[in-house]
């Protein structure tokens, strides 16, 4: 039986999953992420009609990292015909780590999907070709989607990622060798790392992504963000490829389209109802939030929600 939502449900869920804190590992590949306190835990919901619910550290901002890959795809969809995007990046899950080069080499420089690093870099390469100021444009889009004017990039995180960018640079140069990367590699990498370094809270993320629960429309915006078809396509990609190589396990446990980031955030969508954002910085071996997945599993079981 599906239950109605209230803050007490979210508080109870956080109490249930809090014992998991200490069992995961905060991302440490760059110092700026490694310094985050691992005990943080938050959850927020925004419904399609504008109701908000939250518990824990739901208002504390953190580095959204790969969650931004959904946002860059949204911007690309608004500036490119569908066929131009999907001839350069695929729609299939990779089954490989998010920063793998092996599969990319075997498949002639065409990334499996836009939510692995290679695919997101292709999307950023496309934005560089269509936008005069890609970083500023992304800020404008995110601020509009969220309705919050002071969202910005964490310059320390972006700089730290650029200083440790050898593997992502290798991915970009490999794609360039296959003719699937057209612009200056360092410039596109800087844009990509700034997108990953967006700082947002669970509440801001839930509000930002609620359009995906409502066929591309958000209750607080006059114009659709994307078309209903594009919203379905993005949700489908999130369901198959949004949780790195553990998308199948996540579908089994949670049953919602979702996108994670190594900052410990996860955004999940209940179509026609709500967007959910959780944050717990400690990660499982696949790079997904350990307590965050458990919280989403508890929530879908409690509310009786699943797309399957």
UniProtKB/Swiss-Prot annotation:
HAMAP family: Glutaminase. Belongs to the glutaminase family. Keywords: Hydrolase. Substrate binds at residues 66, 117, 161, 168, 192, 244, 262. It is an enzyme of class 3 (hydrolase). It catalyses: L-glutamine + H2O = L-glutamate + NH4(+). Its EC number is 3.5.1.2. This is Glutaminase. Homotetramer. One of its GO terms (molecular function) is glutaminase activity. The gene is glsA. One of its GO terms (biological process) is glutamine catabolic process. InterPro entries: Beta-lactam/transpept-like, Glutaminase.
């Amino acid at each position: 039986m599906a239950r109605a939502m209230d803050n007490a449900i979210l508080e109870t869920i956080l109490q249930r999953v809090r014992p998991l804190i200490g069992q995961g590992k905060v991302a440490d590949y760059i110092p700026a992420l490694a310094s985050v306190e691992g005990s943080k835990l938050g959850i927020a919901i925004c419904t399609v009609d504008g109701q908000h619910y939250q518990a824990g550290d739901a208002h504390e901002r953190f580095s959204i990292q790969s969650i931004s890959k959904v946002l860059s795809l949204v911007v690309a969809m608004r500036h490119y015909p569908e066929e131009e995007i999907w001839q350069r990046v695929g729609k299939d899950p990779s089954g490989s780590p998010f920063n793998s080069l092996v599969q990319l080499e075997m498949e002639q420089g065409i990334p499996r999907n836009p939510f692995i690093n290679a695919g997101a870099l292709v999307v950023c390469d496309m934005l560089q070709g269509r936008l005069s100021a890609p970083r500023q444009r992304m800020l404008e889009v995110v601020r509009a989607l969220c309705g919050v004017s002071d969202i910005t990039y964490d310059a320390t995180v972006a700089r730290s990622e650029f200083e440790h960018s050898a593997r992502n640079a290798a991915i970009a140069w490999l794609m360039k060798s296959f003719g699937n990367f057209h612009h200056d590699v360092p410039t596109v990498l800087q844009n990509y790392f700034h997108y990953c370094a967006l700082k947002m809270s669970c509440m801001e993320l839930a509000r930002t992504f609620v359009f995906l629960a409502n066929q591309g429309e958000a209750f607080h915006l006059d114009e659709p963000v994307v078309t209903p078809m594009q919203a379905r396509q993005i949700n489908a990609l999130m369901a198959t490829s949004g949780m790195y190589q553990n998308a199948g396990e996540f579908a089994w446990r949670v049953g919602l389209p979702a996108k994670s980031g190594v900052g410990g955030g996860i955004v999940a969508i209940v179509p026609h109802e709500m967007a959910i954002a959780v944050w717990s910085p400690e990660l499982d071996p696949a790079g997904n939030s350990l307590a965050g997945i458990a919280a989403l599993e508890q929530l879908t079981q409690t509310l009786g929600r699943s797309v399957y």
